[in-house]
Amino acid sequence: MTPRNPSNYDSLFDSSIFSSTLFSSSLYHSAFDCSFGISFTIQPPIEYIVLSKPCFFAITPLLTLRCNGIAWHDSLDMTIWVSTVTSLPISHCLIVSLSLSHAFPSLFYSALVLSCLSLLCLAFTPRIPFHLHSVVCSYFGRECLSPLFPSPYFTCHNG
């Protein structure tokens, strides 16, 4: 994917969601004729991130399990927001949402991934922010959030 001009950064989120694969791996077990794959995507793609702007980017895991020709795959509806501001501690690694309303293999791996990520965040932080909305708005303000978070949950209000 060809990087765009950084001046177009704010307009990238208006029309469609951009993502690129950061990492992909798979395992195969011949006894059960099963394979398990995991990949991580980043939104926006790494080449779009402008480090001088205090915004977030998202890393989303995609899990795939295939047994006897039947495949389950689930993006987990789980997003980890990581700050591009180097001065912020890793405590601002925020798990926004997790959906477990899918097939059992996805349910199992979703819980496993969430547990590992939670432990990772807890290991490197003195505290986890209580209120995501307040923390995000207080640090980053409306200018950054408007293109990134069209959801009403992330609308920053004055005061």
Curated annotation (Swiss-Prot):
Localization per record: Membrane
Any one GO cellular component localisation term in the record: membrane
Membrane topology of this protein: Multi-pass membrane protein
Intrachain S-S bonds: none
UniProt keyword Transmembrane helix, yes or no: yes
Keyword list, A-Z: Membrane, Transmembrane, Transmembrane helix
Listed transmembrane segments: 22-42, 45-65, 80-100, 104-124
Protein name, as recorded: Putative uncharacterized transmembrane protein C1235.18
